Design a protein with these regions (language model features):
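Detector for outer-membrane/organellar transmembrane beta-barrel domains
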Residues: 1-125
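Conserved C-terminal beta-signal and adjacent last beta-strands/turns
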Residues: 123-133, 142
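C-terminal beta-signal and adjacent terminal beta-strands/loops
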Residues: 137-160
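Short regulatory "switch" loops immediately downstream of catalytic or recognition motifs
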Residues: 96-99, 130-134
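Outer-membrane beta-barrel "beta-signal"
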Residues: 129, 165-180
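Hydrophobic, well-ordered secondary-structure elements that form the walls
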Residues: 36, 75, 127-129, 146, ...
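Short loop/turn motifs that connect adjacent beta-strands in outer-membrane beta-barrel proteins
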Residues: 26-33, 82, 134-144, 180
Length: 180
């Protein structure tokens, strides 16, 4: 990713984002797959589902890229041709990046006193079951998907007297028609 800013004085700042990823899906036993994805970057937070910023801009217009990383590890087990169970664990971490404008005033991401929406990390284990009721190579498939997940979120800053993180349990059910 390329980023540019222009200052009132007609100067410009430039930054080039970089990143890397390692991913694998391995069938370690018949019908049992292990999945691994990872992503480390500077300036690529939007590629982590928009959960981290790409950059911060200081008062003089200079650009500073935000470093972030994410990963997912999990398994899928096809019990029968019509039944699949799965479990994944995923996480996102975004490093703070800010500059001090004046005493008690900062600009950027994750500074003391920033919004509690500036997440330091988000973690989520997921477990689910997929039941395929009907499947045809010509017409598609009809599936019922259930999923449970537990989400934990920790911002860089929280006001005094509030919890350091937030967490929730989520349950999903989905009737899905899969196109051929």
């Amino acid at each position: 990713s390329q980023f540019r800013t222009y200052t009132p004085a007609g100067l410009h700042a430039y930054a080039l984002g970089t990143g890397g990823s390692v991913n694998a899906v391995l069938e370690v036993a018949r019908n049992f797959r292990l999945t691994l994805t990872s992503f480390y970057n500077s300036g690529g937070g939007r590629y982590i589902l928009g959960l981290a910023p790409d950059l911060t801009v200081s008062t003089n217009g200079s650009i500073s890229l935000v470093h972030s990383m994410s990963g997912i590890g999990g398994f899928e087990y096809q019990i029968t041709p019509a039944s699949l169970v799965y479990g994944y664990y995923g996480g996102v971490y975004a490093m703070r990046n800010y500059s001090v404008v004046s005493a008690g005033s900062c600009l950027g991401f994750g500074f003391p006193g920033s919004s509690s929406a500036a997440n330091r990390f988000i973690q989520e284990p997921i477990f689910g079951y997929v039941r395929t009721f009907w499947k045809s190579p010509s017409y598609g498939a009809l599936q019922f998907i259930t999923q449970y997940s537990y989400l934990v979120r920790a911002p860089w800053y929280v006001p005094a007297g509030t919890p350091e993180n937030a967490h929730t349990h989520m349950v999903f059910a989905d009737l899905r028609f899969v196109l051929p």
